[in-house]
């Protein structure tokens, strides 16, 4: 118990595998669940005062936490999840579930968010990664974000300052953490929006191994190629290290089939990169983030 942070939900030495989509990850020294921006500011101020590292995990979807865990504070935004509409502008806190947010837009017959209807994760993580699928991406609808700087200051960042690129945003370099974001949507037809979301979800279910824990798409799309196709051509479908294997359903995914570890994921990623480069001459670049310490 940290007396200066009394009243905030903080768990000591908490295994992160219980919170990640991959079902791997060692313990966080302190895992915190702030309920509002005030509690978040208190946590960050305390960590900075004590020279303790801190980071935000979001919904921990496109992420691998190493088996040794993470030192200092890990902050999760599960309780910072409010979504509000003001006309055609949707504002969501960073912890809002991305899929549920697209459903809110649909309910109000607002179009623009359909592409994200099956992407796991949080609003904050989606902005950080410029998440996208089926021709759409966050940058197409993004207006602005309120962020927390590493020093604990809260400021607003515009779409221009985000400098979005493919699976990239400026805050990947600055260390700023999204705490809320605004998106510009357009009036649409409920049935049309619903049909498009059903179509995209059907495609996702057909092509992706949703029945297993995974970190989502492992590699960025190399120019002129598809990562999954290159992996398949290198005869790596079903290749397994420890409890993690390249999905038979979609070679761009790695799934946890038998109590795999973060080391299994890292070893398999390295093996796939090397094998594909030897086979095709293309060096794959991971899209998934890998953080934390090894055992």
UniProtKB/Swiss-Prot annotation:
Cofactor(s) listed in the protein's UniProt record: FAD
Residues of the active site: 167, 217 (proton donor), 287
One of the GO BP terms on file: cell division
The keyword NADP belongs to this UniProt entry's keyword annotation: yes
Record's keyword terms, sorted: Cell cycle, Cell division, Cell shape, Cell wall biogenesis/degradation, Cytoplasm, FAD, Flavoprotein, NADP, Oxidoreductase, Peptidoglycan synthesis
Family label: Belongs to the MurB family.
Official protein name in the record: UDP-N-acetylenolpyruvoylglucosamine reductase
Gene: murB
